Regions:
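Solvent-exposed, acidic/flexible segments
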Residues: 33-37, 53-57, 61, 85-93, ...
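Sec-exported extracytoplasmic/periplasmic mature domains
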Residues: 45-53, 69, 73, 97-108, ...
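Substrate-binding/active-site groove segments that recognize
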Residues: 56-78, 124-126
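Alpha-helical segment that forms one wall of the substrate-binding/catalytic cleft
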Residues: 74-120, 128-131
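Catalytic and substrate-binding regions of cell-wall glycan-acting enzymes that process beta-1,4-linked
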Residues: 117-157
Length: 157
């Protein structure tokens, strides 16, 4: 074999390896925008069950009290009581937005960047703590309501 044929073989072999390697890479991850996060935050708020006195949930987003301190520390590096969370709608929205942003990014990955599937999974997690829990009943109805509001709120492409 001469030098030219060896070089040609190496070039073809190298091209084949690069092609196979590129095919094995996952599709480019779609970046979740602030507008999408805001749309989901608003959808979760609008879809939340009506607040009733002493229902054990706090704010317009109906957050369980055991999440509030943990989420506040994660998002703001400050502790917050459920009563403080309830009393300060701006701070509550900021914390919810922080958590929902991470949640939506995770669900985008889990749904192969499918927008509505990611939103459905996020809504399920928000209500139950399990992204796949909205198969039927009240949780499925809630997830559908979140999707409907999200579609109205999200930025048009």
């Amino acid at each position: 074999m001469n030098f030219k044929s060896i070089a040609k073989t190496n070039l073809l072999f190298g091209s084949l390896i690069i092609s196979l390697g590129l095919q094995a890479l996952p599709a480019a991850a779609q970046e979740v925008t602030d507008a999408q996060v805001s749309a989901l935050v608003e959808a979760l708020r609008q879809a939340a069950p009506p607040q009733t006195a002493n229902d054990g949930m706090y704010s317009q987003w109906q957050v369980l009290p055991n999440n509030i301190s943990r989420w506040a520390k994660f998002c703001t590096k400050q502790d917050l009581t459920p009563q403080q969370f309830e009393a300060d709608a701006t701070k509550a929205k900021s914390i919810v937005t922080c958590i929902v942003g991470d949640l939506l990014r995770d669900e985008y990955k889990a749904s192969s960047n499918n927008d509505l599937t990611a939103v459905r999974r996020a809504a399920c997690w928000w209500m139950t703590g399990d992204s796949a829990a909205c198969k039927s009943g009240a949780t499925a109805t809630y997830a559908e309501k979140v999707i409907s509001v999200y579609q109205q709120q999200r930025p048009k492409k």
